[in-house]
Amino acid sequence: MSTKPVLPDLLALFTPLFDQCTPDEQRILLAVLERLAAEHYRRWAEGLSDPAQKRDFLAAAAREEHIAAVLEGLGPRAEHLARTVWQRFPHLRTLYADAIQPLSREEQWKVQSIGEHGGAELLRSFAAAEVNPDGRAKLLVCAAEDEENAQLLAEVLKTMGAQ
């Protein structure tokens, strides 16, 4: 009898961190998480033999970096806030990595896909609170990029038969 592994609940993992942040810090925290996700996409790409998949994963990493840059660009003190976030949460880099480390690559992708949907939802909530129309539009584009990454992972998993 095989048992399905329990996948980490990213909402439970990261909500307490967001709860400790001001709204401006929340954007920067998400930017940090997007950059960390980009690192994972690049690492996964290194392990892929299919050139098209490798290209797609590197494109996903680029989207994550773009989202982070947009989030950082929406406020004047991004660098200061990033230092604050890293000081408050020095374990941030390992928190997610440790949560997915025992999982297979496909399970990691499933968790990441769920995380992408959560990131998109958070970006849409930031957009709803944004008073600047240009900033709101940028955040909605970023939400679509997170959804695009979730879709990529879902398609790869479907192709592999590992939904």
Where in this protein do the model-derived segments appear?
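Non-heme di-metal
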Residues: S2-Q163
